[in-house]
């Protein structure tokens, strides 16, 4: 299926504080070499004064500036995040207010690290010809990290990225070509974060009240096995729907979870090195923000051109996976 899906602008926003692997060695028993060998990560950005909302607002403002559109031209704002500042109001309505997009409907989605590519599907389904959306992934995962647990603390970073997308008819480039999405809820317990304690005057439960269940808990081997099996399958199914081969794709914009996972996916699909851009070394795993941050850098560095075919793939908590095939 080919429908219009034109990306008019891309942007990213990062906290000013950068934390290196060497700095983490002061908090836990680890080393720079240990982290690099197992994850490919050298540093990550950590929010101090920034919030999930402020990072998302920065991205939205950049998108409007690049596209030269007024905020009142925006019809839809979706923020993908698993680390909102509040349960309510959600992040997207705060972005709407900050930029003055009074006509836009605005809501958040939480599909963890797969959130951005699920947001792409929602934008594709929602937009009518002539309408425009802001799709933003924004995370401050540092609030969900136990900074003494080296199995998870070394992985995550904070940041935001986004796209301004329009369903502009009669264009020769900018199309949605296909997609694939799947959820494996029975395996959801292999990756958890943010457990809320059940506390009220009538409850005898203490779920998470006296523990660190709010922090990331992950069965690394199970998540790795899931990703290296289901991500290639999702990409293959999305390409099949788009009636394309992997050789037709300029770049695979994968969630930057772990360099070993990304490389394994590339090997299973027989992809060329230049088809698998990576920036995890600089930012770590920024969950729903990772694909739009990577894509914004690719555009800025002129690594993609109009008419290029791309695959965006996200995977993670849920457990969930999704792939979107587009023409830029």
Curated annotation (Swiss-Prot):
Example of a GO MF term: beta-ketoacyl-acyl-carrier-protein synthase III activity
InterPro entries membership: ACP_syn_III_C (IPR013747), ACP_syn_III_N (IPR013751), FabH (IPR004655), Thiolase-like (IPR016039)
Tagged with keyword Acyltransferase: yes
Name of the top EC class for this enzyme: transferase
Compartments, as annotated in UniProt: Cytoplasm
BP-aspect Gene Ontology terms: fatty acid biosynthetic process; secondary metabolite biosynthetic process
Region feature (ACP-binding): 256-260
Keyword flag Lipid metabolism: yes
Pathway(s) of this molecule: Lipid metabolism; fatty acid biosynthesis
Catalytic activity: malonyl-[ACP] + acetyl-CoA + H(+) = 3-oxobutanoyl-[ACP] + CO2 + CoA
Entry keyword set: Acyltransferase, Cytoplasm, Fatty acid biosynthesis, Fatty acid metabolism, Lipid biosynthesis, Lipid metabolism, Multifunctional enzyme, Transferase
Domain notes: The last Arg residue of the ACP-binding site is essential for the weak association between ACP/AcpP and FabH.
Oligomeric and partner information: Homodimer.
Record's protein name: Beta-ketoacyl-[acyl-carrier-protein] synthase III 2
Organism: Lactiplantibacillus plantarum (strain ATCC BAA-793 / NCIMB 8826 / WCFS1) (Lactobacillus plantarum)
């Amino acid at each position: 299926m080919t429908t219009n899906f034109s990306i008019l602008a891309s942007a990213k926003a990062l906290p000013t504080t950068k934390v290196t692997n060497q700095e983490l060695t002061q908090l836990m028993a680890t080393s720079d070499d240990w982290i690099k060998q197992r994850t490919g990560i050298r540093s990550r950005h950590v929010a101090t004064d920034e919030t999930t909302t402020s990072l998302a607002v920065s991205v939205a403002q950049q998108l409007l500036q690049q596209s030269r559109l007024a905020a009142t031209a925006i019809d839809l704002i979706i923020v993908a995040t698993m680390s909102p500042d509040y349960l309510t109001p959600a992040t997207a309505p705060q972005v709407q207010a900050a930029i003055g997009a009074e006509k836009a409907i605005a809501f958040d989605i939480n599909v963890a690290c797969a959130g951005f590519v699920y947001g792409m599907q929602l934008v594709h389904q929602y937009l009518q010809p002539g309408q425009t959306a802001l799709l933003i992934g924004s995370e401050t995962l540092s609030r969900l990290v136990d900074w003494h647990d080296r199995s998870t603390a070394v992985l995550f970073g904070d940041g935001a990225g986004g796209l301004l997308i329009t369903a502009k008819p009669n264009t020769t480039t900018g199309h949605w070509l296909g997609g694939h999405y799947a959820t494996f809820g029975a395996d959801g317990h292999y990756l958890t974060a943010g457990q809320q304690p059940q506390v009220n005057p009538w409850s005898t439960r203490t779920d998470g009240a006296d523990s660190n269940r709010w922090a990331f808990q992950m069965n690394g081997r199970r998540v790795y096995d899931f990703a290296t099996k289901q991500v290639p399958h999702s990409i293959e199914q999305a390409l099949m729907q788009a009636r394309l081969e992997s050789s037709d794709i300029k770049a695979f914009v994968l969630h930057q979870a772990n360099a070993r996972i990304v490389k394994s996916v590339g090997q299973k699909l027989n992809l060329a090195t230049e088809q698998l851009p990576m920036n995890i070394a600089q930012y770590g795993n920024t969950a729903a923000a990772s694909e739009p941050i990577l894509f914004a850098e690719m555009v800025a560095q002129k690594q993609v051109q109009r008419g290029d075919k791309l695959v965006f793939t996200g995977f993670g908590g849920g457990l969930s996976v999704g792939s979107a095939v587009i023409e830029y």
